[in-house]
Curated annotation (Swiss-Prot):
Topology of this chain in the membrane: Multi-pass membrane protein
Top-level division of the source organism's lineage: Bacteria
One GO BP: transmembrane transport
Disulfide bonds: none
Subcellular location: Cell inner membrane
One GO CC annotation: ATP-binding cassette (ABC) transporter complex
Annotated keywords: Cell inner membrane, Cell membrane, Membrane, Transmembrane, Transmembrane helix, Transport
Function in brief: Part of an ATP-driven transport system CT_067/CT_068/CT_069/CT_070 for a metal.
Native source organism of the sequence: Chlamydia trachomatis serovar D (strain ATCC VR-885 / DSM 19411 / UW-3/Cx)
Protein name: Probable metal transport system membrane protein CT_070
Transmembrane segments: 1-21, 39-59, 64-84, 94-114, 124-144, 170-190, 196-216, 226-246, 252-272, 285-305
């Protein structure tokens, strides 16, 4: 059954949530026709939670730079897959997975190879690999596709092109991330804080690093169509950075990360729809979500700094 008019048509910001939650609690989301707004909320929320799980460990391990490199260099693998499959937009999940995993492993191996063979600092080898692979991907994208629209979708995604079939893959990625993080939680935490102590306990540090790399690539694959390979970096890192400001334990940090990421995922589609309804302007849903995450970070940073300043002033007064 395909409805002619979306119940979200012409709604305001608050009305969007009234419509969505009424459809959710009435069960229509499970057996009725899913509209693009329903799909965007579901997919963005799953992406936010999935990326928040991995992002917590990336922030703790100070792998933000590596995540940045992978989110850019993975474009090289996607362009190569486009060339072999002759599919520029409708890539299969298998092709995306192969591209993401192979490029992630290639990036990590290249960084270690340059660092160990040429005896340069890890930051220098990371910057070199990033520059080479990302520039190569852009050159291939420009000279072989000559299609700016395709390039835009690869970079920032296209939330309006999401379909019902995109829900299952991202939930599979979410379950994989949650399952592996639960099984190896203590190892991830131990390696994140003290690699020497983790090694003394018999934890295989390299294996843990590769597991995190695989979770990272899986998260980027899940987020590719909705937010692109570059916007996914914000979903991976910003919620974790926000949570780190206020959390007192790793568990709290992961929960707060999911909360802030989930809030951005819920608000962005509603904000995009309301702006379209009121002003007739279509804005990128993924761009709005990233903008909201940045606003959350600035607000929490100001709040934490103000709280610390007040506490310091109270101590000085005593």
């Amino acid at each position: 059954m395909v409805a002619s008019i979306s119940p979200y048509y012409g709604v305001s910001f608050l009305e969007f949530f009234l419509v969505f939650f009424s459809r959710l609690f009435s069960g229509k989301l499970f057996y009725d026709h899913l509209y693009i707004d329903d799909i965007q909320v579901i997919v963005f929320f799953a992406i936010a939670v999935s990326c928040s799980v991995v992002g917590t460990f990336l922030v703790l391990k100070k792998m933000a730079m590596y995540a940045n490199v992978v989110s850019h260099t993975i474009l090289f693998g996607l362009v190569c897959v486009c060339l072999f499959t002759h599919q520029l937009i409708h890539l299969s999940m298998q092709a995306l997975t192969i591209a993401a995993v192979s490029t992630t492993l290639l990036t990590g191996a290249s960084i270690h190879f340059i660092r160990n063979v040429f005896k340069v600092a890890e930051e220098a080898s990371t910057a070199l690999v990033f520059s080479l692979l990302f520039s190569a991907s852009l050159l291939l994208l420009v000279f072989l596709t000559r299609n700016a629209h395709v390039g835009t979708e690869l970079v920032i995604g296209n939330a309006d092109a999401l379909a019902k079939t995109d829900i299952l893959p991202i939930f599979l990625v979410l379950l994989i991330n949650l399952g592996i993080s639960y099984c190896f939680f203590s190892s991830f935490v131990c390696v994140s804080f003290d690699t020497i102590f983790a090694f003394s306990l018999g934890i295989r540090i390299r294996l843990v690093d590769y597991l995190i790399m695989l979770l990272l690539s899986a998260s980027i694959v899940g987020a590719f169509k909705a937010v692109g390979v570059l916007m996914s970096l914000a979903f991976l890192l910003i919620p974790g950075l926000i949570a780190k400001l206020i959390a007192s334990s790793v568990q709290e940090m992961m929960v707060y990360s999911m909360v802030f990421g989930g809030l951005a995922a819920l608000i962005a589609p509603a904000l995009s729809r309301s702006i379209l309804s009121i002003y007739g302007i279509g804005l990128s849903t993924s761009g709005l979500a990233v903008g909201l995450l940045l606003v959350f970070y600035v607000v929490m940073l100001v709040f934490v700094c103000s709280k610390r300043a007040i506490m310091l002033r109270q101590k000085l007064d005593k």
